[in-house]
Amino acid sequence: MKNRFLVLGLVAVVLVFVIIGLCIWLPYTSGKPDHVYSRAAVATDAKRCSEIGRDILQEGGSVVDAAIASLLCMGLMNAHSMGIGGGLFFTIYNSTTGKVEVINAREVAPRLANTTMFNNSKDSEEGGLSVAVPGEIRGYELAHQRHGRLPWARLFQPSIQLARHGFPVGKGLAIALDKKRDVIEKTPALCEVFCRQGKVLQEGETVTMPKLADTLQILAQEGAKAFYNGSLTAQIVKDIQEAGGIMTVEDLNNYRAELIEHPMSIGLGDATLYVPSAPLSGPVLILILNILKGYNFSPKSVATPEQKALTYHRIVEAFRFAYAKRTMLGDPKFVDVSQVIRNMSSEFYATQLRARITDETTHPAAYYEPEFYLQDDGGTAHLSAVSEDGSAVAATSTINLYFGSKVLSRVSGILFNDEMDDFSSPNFINQFRVAPSPANFIKPGKQPLSSMCPSIILDKDGQVRMVVGASGGTQITTSVALAIINSLWFGYDVKRAVEEPRLHNQLLPNTTTVEKDIDQVVTAGLKIRHHHTEVTPTFIAVVQAVVRASGGWAAASDSRKGGEPAGY
């Protein structure tokens, strides 16, 4: 009996020590936010690429240096989404000057392109005719000329090594390979890179890109001119023309990235959002937020089931009004969209639209007055980064649909975009019986409309508060809006702001798409208000964000694509 009491006594003592230990230890573990860095942070959609950016910053590189090095890596590890055969937009905050600027390096239509070249065919989605003039490398060049600190060639070295020696297929690339399995296995040039024994690679298997490594080495040594007016130019044109394209040497010679010194901006309480204007979707994002800020959202807006259901109904209605107006946007160098953009950025206009939102019900598509129809655009990749000096970059890059044009050069290893598919065509018959948008028709040298919106938010003192953007085609703009709403208005930490289940509505089709883990209170509330909802079998977009936190910079790379941030 005594032995039994002795054992029980010892167990009790051990339990006391365990409980005391947990009380001391838990506050320092479970209470500590994930991925908070005291000095600098880089959030990409691939862990290794975030680490490359961090390493560049620790070497003394600028935030633009880090972004370029990370983007080159992302073009390998998520080659289905972006790469040097595509184009991008940078939004850059320079803490020394206190100014935000945008660099436009989006692809343009070749000079032999014309409005009716596709005639409702699939040629805009794959093959040489779908390839627009790439802008990626010219974009890197201009950004580096303005803000670079380390030598240009240094930024290429990590990706040259990765391409030459190989890297494991990550979650995002594995999903894309599985989705496009048939076309990849039937396309020899693609299968040489992305297959093993004739079957697409699986997650964790090693992929090498030796030809692309050689091309990156040439670009590192010779600069951007090698691509546009140098040793790589003739082969690029040959590859595209042999695949049925119309690109010429002159198209590459004449391509220039554009500096925009006064991007769009909007006041959000004591903060200011900066974002690119058309042909990107900054005006759409601004209209969504302008409509919604009149509701004075706060943590209370999602505190009860009733409030949460109403709040999400209002959000979806704002999406629908904004996407109706998106159909009138196009490249401002070719079409006069100044009045449309003025309206979309006007608080008075947003107030008028907000007054048309009824809290009891949604409405048929015609209620929101869509002028035209715009087809979906494709996937992308996004990076958000902040450096020690408080400078920041939001960069969104794309080759459009998964694996772009499916034209991969067996000489240079470059995978080319299918950005021509982002234009509208007068001969395209859509299922909604809404006319295609003339503002987005093809013209030589024109840029197609895009959903991308790399965003930087500054506080009232001009310091970075949030850097955010997304990939995921037409769902990009709504997902960036939700991340901003979650962070600024609902008070979520950055991880929750990014990971919170999302929903999307672009008016046409007249369906609200929701992720499977979304709160049932939200879907029930939408149903009561006559929304048609569908659960997506996959996910809605992929967001990367960095937010100022008490301990420094809190960073989040969306788990939907398997990314992870890095910093120090």
UniProtKB/Swiss-Prot annotation:
Protein name: Glutathione hydrolase 1 proenzyme
Places the protein is found: Cell membrane
Membrane topology designation: Single-pass type II membrane protein
Function statement: Cleaves the gamma-glutamyl bond of extracellular glutathione (gamma-Glu-Cys-Gly), glutathione conjugates (such as maresin conjugate (13R)-S-glutathionyl-(14S)-hydroxy-(4Z,7Z,9E,11E,16Z,19Z)-docosahexaenoate, MCTR1) and other gamma-glutamyl compounds (such as leukotriene C4, LTC4). The metabolism of glutathione by GGT1 releases free glutamate and the dipeptide cysteinyl-glycine, which is hydrolyzed to cysteine and glycine by dipeptidases.
GO biological process, one term: regulation of immune system process
Residues engaged in binding L-glutamate: R106, T398, I399, N400, E419, D422, S450, S451, G473
Keyword terms of this UniProt record: Acyltransferase, Cell membrane, Disulfide bond, Glutathione biosynthesis, Glycoprotein, Hydrolase, Membrane, Protease, Signal-anchor, Transferase, Transmembrane, Transmembrane helix, Zymogen
Residue intervals on the Extracellular side: 27-568
Quaternary structure and interacting proteins, as annotated: Heterodimer composed of the light and heavy chains. The active site is located in the light chain.
Regulation: Activated by autocatalytic cleavage.
Family matches, as Pfam families: G_glu_transpept (PF01019)
Catalytic activity: an N-terminal (5-L-glutamyl)-[peptide] + an alpha-amino acid = 5-L-glutamyl amino acid + an N-terminal L-alpha-aminoacyl-[peptide]; glutathione + H2O = L-cysteinylglycine + L-glutamate; an S-substituted glutathione + H2O = an S-substituted L-cysteinylglycine + L-glutamate; leukotriene C4 + H2O = leukotriene D4 + L-glutamate
Effect of inactivating the gene: Deficient mice have growth retardation, skeletal abnormalities. They are sexually immature, develop cataracts, and have coats with a gray cast. Most die between 10 and 18 weeks. They cannot break down GSH into its constituent amino acids as it passes through the proximal tubules of the kidney. They excrete large amounts of GSH in their urine, leading to a fatal cysteine deficiency.
Pathway it works in: Sulfur metabolism; glutathione metabolism; Lipid metabolism; leukotriene D4 biosynthesis
Coiled-coil positions: none
InterPro entries cross-referenced by the UniProt entry: GGT_CS, GGT_lsub_C, GGT_peptidase, GGT_ssub, Ntn_hydrolases_N
Organism: Mus musculus (Mouse)
PANTHER family named in the record: GAMMA GLUTAMYL TRANSPEPTIDASE, GLUTATHIONE HYDROLASE 1 PROENZYME-RELATED
Main subcellular location: membrane
Disease: Defects in Ggt1 are a cause of glutathionuria, severe growth failure, reduced life spans and infertility. Ggt1-deficient mice have multiple metabolic abnormalities and are dwarf. Some abnormalities can be ameliorated by N-acetylcysteine treatment.
E.C. numbers: 3.4.19.13, 2.3.2.2, 3.4.19.14
Family: Belongs to the gamma-glutamyltransferase family.
Sugar attachment sites: N94, N114, N119, N229, N343, N510
Active site, renumbered: T380 (nucleophile)
Transmembrane segments: 5-26
